[in-house]
Structures are given as structure tokens and as C-alpha cells.
Curated annotation (Swiss-Prot):
Keyword Membrane: yes
Biological process annotations from GO: dolichol-linked oligosaccharide biosynthetic process; protein N-linked glycosylation
Name of encoding gene: ALG8
Reactions catalysed according to its record: an alpha-D-Glc-(1->3)-alpha-D-Man-(1->2)-alpha-D-Man-(1->2)-alpha-D-Man-(1->3)-[alpha-D-Man-(1->2)-alpha-D-Man-(1->3)-[alpha-D-Man-(1->2)-alpha-D-Man-(1->6)]-alpha-D-Man-(1->6)]-beta-D-Man-(1->4)-beta-D-GlcNAc-(1->4)-alpha-D-GlcNAc-diphospho-di-trans,poly-cis-dolichol + a di-trans,poly-cis-dolichyl beta-D-glucosyl phosphate = an alpha-D-Glc-(1->3)-alpha-D-Glc-(1->3)-alpha-D-Man-(1->2)-alpha-D-Man-(1->2)-alpha-D-Man-(1->3)-[alpha-D-Man-(1->2)-alpha-D-Man-(1->3)-[alpha-D-Man-(1->2)-alpha-D-Man-(1->6)]-alpha-D-Man-(1->6)]-beta-D-Man-(1->4)-beta-D-GlcNAc-(1->4)-alpha-D-GlcNAc-diphospho-di-trans,poly-cis-dolichol + a di-trans,poly-cis-dolichyl phosphate + H(+)
Keywords: Endoplasmic reticulum, Glycosyltransferase, Membrane, Transferase, Transmembrane, Transmembrane helix
Organism annotation: Gibberella zeae (strain ATCC MYA-4620 / CBS 123657 / FGSC 9075 / NRRL 31084 / PH-1) (Wheat head blight fungus)
InterPro entries assigned: Glyco_trans_ALG6/ALG8
Record protein name field: Dolichyl pyrophosphate Glc1Man9GlcNAc2 alpha-1,3-glucosyltransferase
Lumenal-side positions: 1-4, 125-128, 201-221, 276-319, 377-383, 427-446, 494-501
Residue numbers on the Cytoplasmic membrane side: 26-103, 150-179, 243-252, 341-355, 405, 468-472
Amino acid sequence: MSEHYPTLAQTALVAAAFKILLFPAYKSTDFEVHRNWLAITNSLPLEKWYVEKTSEWTLDYPPFFAYFEWILAHVARLVDPLMVKVYNLDYDSWQTVYFQRTSVIVTELVLVWALQTFIETAPLKSRRAAQTVALSIILSPGLLIIDHIHFQYNGFMYGILVMSLVLARQNSELLSSGLIFAALLCFKHIYLYLAPAYFVYLLRAYCLSSKSIFRIRFLNSIKLGLGIGAIFGAAFGPFAAMDQIPQLLSRLFPFSRGLCHAYWAPNVWALYSFADRILIHVAPRLGWAVNKSALQSVTRGLVGDTAFAVLPEISPRTCFVLTLFFQVVPLIKLFFQPTWETFIGAVTLCGYSSFLFGWHVHEKAILLVIIPFSLIALRDRRHLGAFRPLVVAGYVSLFPLLFTPAEFPIKTIYTIVWLVVFLLAFGRLAPASNKPRIFLLDRFSTLYIAISIPLILYCSLLHHLIFGKAYEFIPLMFTSSYTAIGVVGSWVGYMVVYFTA
């Protein structure tokens, strides 16, 4: 290990100390969501967990996460008994705040463990690069903003994902990798978007013979099938016994939401929505029809309120077909070339597809792309060229989550320092590729990062100084649309890299 880098444990310890200082910071409604889930799982019997609706923040994660909240609730009630009362809505005593913030830091140790495993199992010549990647993830601005200020438990669950991905590097651990991922699906169903890559990789590398795709390894297939069945049985079995599966699924998959969230996630539909806003002013001059009712909604993506004034409406089916198509394309290569690097690339592209074309995507889901991609970003300079605009766009797109003045210097300074330190380090560590570099991608990456600096300055500071509270949607629209260009450009660039590697 290079003496120039602190160890992962040392870094995690310093990061935890910094996160403790953020305990009094802004917290979103997600804080009350998780407090309410503590109360539901502590105060009510199992059969009422997915029925209870005293609060609007009903339990809508899979059963393993509910069991996780149940375990936390046993400690929470010792810290502050009022914290775990269902009727005690919007309760946020200092004991509650400190307990919930601490639980995020402690459970993030799963991510530290997974990243340490990633370092230790990396080839010796790649150990220094693996160390740098691990540090970049544990210090991720995304996790700091989403988990430790806004409030969620992504570090814990991405730790499970990273462990599964790392174990997949060893043929002897493929079964463990698949079972850990199955357990992850029972914690949070958003990871279903990555499941196609797992299915193809485990089918090809574990269930079929390496010599012939027509020879099935029956024992491996049985072990994998029984293991996954046991995990899903442990998660959903009790609710199936109570005939609550339809109710549970209605909580997990609510389809009444609109195409875009209130703040457009930086994906294809953000660009589509932006184009529609521009066409509202152009269409009358061209003689195009304008949907007058859609003009009533300046911010799109409110529940059940996604309407376009000029462009055609987008249906959930359209989103599903596009997502599936752009996932299947890289899976074809994975099936015929089932290496670990190709697998991580396919997982990354599945994350891209679901984020770019999915229905009602949240900006926080960008971590589905960034974290898997990080594991292979230093494979060579071509990979890094596609990765750079992704992290710039992805992390900047999270800024609107923290809209209070006190958090402005934290999110901007921390993110900019992270980008400068790690993108410079990555540039020094990424080896040259044996394939020619993509000129347009290199220029796009450099130009995109350069333009992002004044954009951040305007959207985060100058707009408010110039216009005050007027035109508040403009910086959000600019941020969403510009970061969408970065994510889409990164995706196109990585698709080229993936298929020519």
C-alpha cells in the first residue's frame, strides 16, 4: 500500500468525525419518514406494518428494511421512548436526531468493510488505484449530501451492493455474490434495475459450463435457486402467510406518480421537459398546437401531474421499453464475454438505462451509476474519460436537495474539493489504453467541466442575489438540464468504451 495515502479505516474515522459535526444540519422529510418507520415497526404487530397510514409517510420499502428498522427501534426506544410512538408525528427531539444520525454513520461501516475487501482482493498492480477509488467512495459528496444531511441509509445498502460486486470477482464466491444481491433486493427494490446484469452473469458464469452454453451445471443452479428462494421466503413469507402480498406490492410500486419528480432528475426526460418549455414559446410562431391546460404547471412531476404543452405525453410503457432495450444491448456482450470487468460495466449500463429512461426517477438514484462505475473507472484513461462528466453532473445535480443557506458552503466547497482532489488523482493513476482515445469524448469532458463552474456559481448564488425569490424555477431548470447533458454524454461515451474494450 502506498505510504502517500491514509488507510481506509483512518479516512472513515475522520469522515465520521466530520459527519458528527453535521448532526444539527438541515434534515429533509426523509428524517420523519424513517422515524415513523421506527414507530410502526416498534408499536404495531407485523400484520399492520404495510397497512398503517396514520402518517402520510407509510412504510414502502421491502421487508428486510422493515426488519432493519425493527432492530433499530429496540435501541431507539431506550434512547427516547416518544421517538417510537406512531401518533407522535414530526417528533424530532435532540435525542431522536442524534440517534438517527448516529445510526446512519454506524451502519455505513458495511460500506467500509466492502471497500476494504475491494482493496484486498484487487490485483497487486492495481492495489494503489483500488485504494484511491475506495477513498473516493467513502468520502463521496453524494453520500454526504443524501445520507448525512438530507437523511437516508444509502451507505449501508451500497455497502451490501459493493460487497456483492467484489465477491463476483472470484469464481469461488459467485454464489455468495448472488445471494447477497438477492438480500439487497429485499432491503430496497430500486436495485431491481441492476438485476438483469446479475441474472445474465450468474447464468453464464455460474449456472452454465464455461466450455459450452448448452451444458447446465445443475448443482450450481439448484444451490442458487434454493438460496434465492430461501432469502425471498424469509423476507416475504410472513406477509404471504397473512395474504398481504398485494397490499405490500401496492406500497412498493405506486404508479400514480408522474413522469418527472418535482425537481427533474438529470435524465432524458429532463431534457425532454426542458425542450417542451422552450417549444411553448416557439410553437405559436410555427403554428403548432399548444396544450393550454399544461401551462398551468410550471414545475412538472407532482404526483399524477405530468403534462406536456407541445411534445407528446410519455407513458410508463414507453419508459419500460426504452429502459429494457438499452439494458439488453450491453447484456448481449456480457453473455458472450462473462468477465468481471464486463459484468461491472453491464451493471453500470443497467444503472444508466434505468436512470435515464425510467419513470419518476429521483436525482438520488444517480448513485446507482456512480458507485458501480467507480470500481472500474481507473481501468484506463478511456474509462476515466466517460466517468469524469458523470461525477461532476451527478454530484452537482444533488445540490437542490439542500436549499437552506447554512448548507450552501458545505455542499459546494466539499464537492468542489472532492472533484479537484480525486479527478486529479484519478488522472495520474489511470493507465493509458491500448485502444485509441475518443477525441470527442475527451473534449466533451473538458468543456463540460469548465462550463459547470460558472453554472454552479449562477444557480447557487448569483441568481438569488440578482432576482431574489423571483423566477425560482430557472436555476433548478438550468441545473437539471445541464447536468442531464453531462449524464447523457457520459452514457454515450461509456457505451462506446464498453463495446470497443
